[in-house]
Design a protein with these regions (language model features):
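Accessory RNA-recognition modules of RNA-modification enzymes
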Residues: 1-174
Length: 174
């Protein structure tokens, strides 16, 4: 159930039924899980960037390991070899690359399950230096020329060097 956390007691509406599972829409959280936290990001409910921002750090790492184990199991591989998740102790500003999408005259993250870019804002996942890059490109995106931008990839290395790649799509109509 999207928006719920394991251990939540919820009221939900079933919206589809497949052979091996149901899909439901969250109506109300009646009792919160012990794993649930208040997301620090103001855009958490809008943005598809930080899907695990509403659970505590220990549980986040447990889910990540379970995801890998599940993928190994489905592929018929030995999942016993999957170790604990390697992670940074920092939950903020740890990303060294992001992809932003162009929509509505600016770059941003896609809203969850859509192709609509939402305000990049002050994303807590990436370094603060990325904000200046995104702000600059958004202010000058009309200067790119005759091709419409589609995506922007920002990456940095341990020395702090930043690489920006802007991908273009269709030709802008004249």
């Amino acid at each position: 159930i999207g928006g719920s956390v394991e251990g939540d007691l919820v009221k939900a509406e079933i919206i589809s039924h497949e052979k091996n599972y149901y899909t439901a829409k969250l109506i109300e959280i009646i009792e919160e899980s012990e794993y649930r936290i208040t997301p620090e990001c103001a855009n958490f409910s809008l943005c598809g960037g930080c899907t695990l921002g509403n659970i505590n750090f220990e549980y986040e790492n447990k889910i990540k390991k379970q995801t890998v184990v599940s993928a190994f199991r489905r592929a018929g591989l030995d999942y016993a070899i999957v170790g604990d998740t390697l992670h940074t102790d920092e939950r903020k500003h740890y990303r060294n690359n992001i992809t932003l999408h162009y929509n509505g005259g600016k770059f941003g993250y896609y809203a969850e399950k859509t192709n609509v870019a939402v305000d990049f804002g002050k994303c807590l996942l990436c370094p603060a230096s990325y904000y200046a890059v995104a702000d600059y490109v958004n202010a000058h995106v009309s200067d790119i020329g005759m091709f419409a931008p589609s995506d922007m990839h920002i990456r940095d290395n341990s020395a702090g060097d930043i690489t920006v790649s802007i991908y273009t799509g269709k030709k802008v109509p004249e």
